[in-house]
Amino acid sequence: MKNKTRFALFLAVLCTAAVLAADYFVPLQTDNPDTGQLPAVYDGRKNGRAPAVKNQGSLGTCWAFASLQALEARLLPEESLDFSEDHMSLNNGFCIPQEEGGEYTMSMAYLLSWQGPVLESEDPYGDGTSPKGLKAVKHVQEIQMIPGKDYEKIKRAVLRYGGVQSSLYTAMNGDRSKSDSYNESASAYCYIGSEPPNHDSVIIGWDDGFSKDNFNVPVNGDGAFICMNSWGDGFGDQGFFYVSYYDSNIGMNNIVYSKVEDPGRYDKIYQSDLRGWVGQLGYGNDTAWFSNVYKAEESQYLKAVGFYATAPGTSYEIYAVRQAGKESDITEGYEFDRKIFLADGAFENAGYYTVSFDKKTKKELKLKKGERFAVIVKITTPDTVHPAAIEYDAGDGRTFVDLSDGEGYISADGKVWERVEEKQNCNLCLKAYTAAQ
C-alpha cells in the first residue's frame, strides 16, 4: 500500500494518588445556557445540581470520583444517583492499580463501552473487590471535550450539563494536607508553575468577583471556579473549594457527559475497543476512512454508529455495507463500493459522539442474524495528521489490548483498504448499535 499509516500516542496519566431515553437538561430561569449572557456568579449547589461530596481516602482514584460526580451532576435534579467509583477503578481494563491513579480517557473507555456506571450500593468503595456481572444502569452515548482555557465554553457547559470534569496540579493529598498554593481560611487554591496536572475535580460553578486577595500567590485579577473535590466534607467549604482563573492547569483538560440515556434505546453494542482512545492513526493529512466489520448476533436494525472526533471541527460521512464479504474482497477494493450512505455532519468539539439513523428506511438497515455488516466513516479533522482514534498497546505496561475481537480496516481514499489488526496492531474506535425495532 502506497500510503503509510502512522501512530500518535494519546494516553497519559493525569491523576495520581496525590490526589434513553431522556436528554437531561435543567434550563435556568433567565438565560439560554448556549447563547445568553453569562451570570457573574453561578453555584450548582444552589440550583440542586451538586451531588453529595465523597471521599477517595488514600487511593489514587480522584479521576473516577471526578468522572462519576460529573455524571451524577449531569442527571440532577431529575435523578439523584450514587455511582460506584470502586467498579470504575477496578473494572476499566487498564493495568493500573487503584493506588497509582488514572485519567479521564480511562473513564471515557469504561462508560462508552457500557461497562458502567453501576450503583454504589452494588459495589461499595474501598474494599478492593468488585462483584462480577453487574450491568450499567445508564448508557453514556456522548462525551464532549471542552477546549483548554476556554472559560466561556466551560461556564456554558456547567450551565447545560451540571459539571465539567477538569484537572489541576496539587501537592496536597487529602483534607488535612497543607500547600503554599492553598489558603485554607478562604478555601482558595491557585498554583502557578510548570508542574503537569495530577488531580481531577468537578467544576460546578464560578464567581467572577472572588477576590484575588484570597489566594496565597499573586494573581492578575479576581475570579474563581467553584470546584467539587473528593476529599470528604472536611476539606474546604464542606468539600468544595475555589480555584483561581489564573491557576496554570484548571480548565486545560475538560470533559462533559453530554448525552446520557436509560438502557433500552439500543439492545446491543458492537465494539472492539474496550480500552477506548489510546492513540491515533492516519496518513499524514486530515482525512482518513475507517471501518469495522461485525457479525449480527440477532436479527435487528442498525440504529447508530459511535466514534471519536479527535479534535474540534471534525466532519464526517457514515456508510454501511450489508452482507460484507471476506477480508480479501475488502482489501482488494471490491466490497465497500456497495456502501449505503447513512449520515453526515460535523462536531464543534472533540469527544465521542453517537450518530443515529432514525430517518433511514427499515428495509435498508434490517440485519439478519449471522450477517456480516460493515460500518464505515470518512473523517476529516482540521490541523491533524492522525484523525482516526485507535486502541493499541503503547508498550508502557498500562494497557492490555485484545486484537482477536476486531476486524477493522483503514484507507486513505476509501478505495484501497488495509487490515489494522494485522498491519498496525490496533483496534479502531468505531462502535455500532442495534435494536429490535
Which ranges hold each PLM region?
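Aromatic- and Gly/Pro-enriched, solvent-exposed loop/edge beta-strand patches characteristic
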Residues: 313-401
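Alpha-helical support elements that line or immediately flank enzyme active sites
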Residues: 56-79
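N-terminal secretory signal peptides that target proteins for export/translocation
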Residues: 1-2
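Short, flexible active-site-proximal loops enriched in glycine and acidic residues
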Residues: 77-87
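Sec-dependent N-terminal signal peptides of Gram-positive bacterial secreted proteins and lipoproteins
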Residues: 6-20
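Predominantly the structural core of cysteine protease catalytic domains
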Residues: 25-48, 64-72, 89-312, 317, ...
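Short beta-strand-to-coil "C-cap" segments at the C-terminal boundary of structured domains/repeats
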Residues: 207, 258-261, 322-324, 430-437
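Short, surface-exposed beta-strand/loop patches at domain edges
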Residues: 369, 378-437
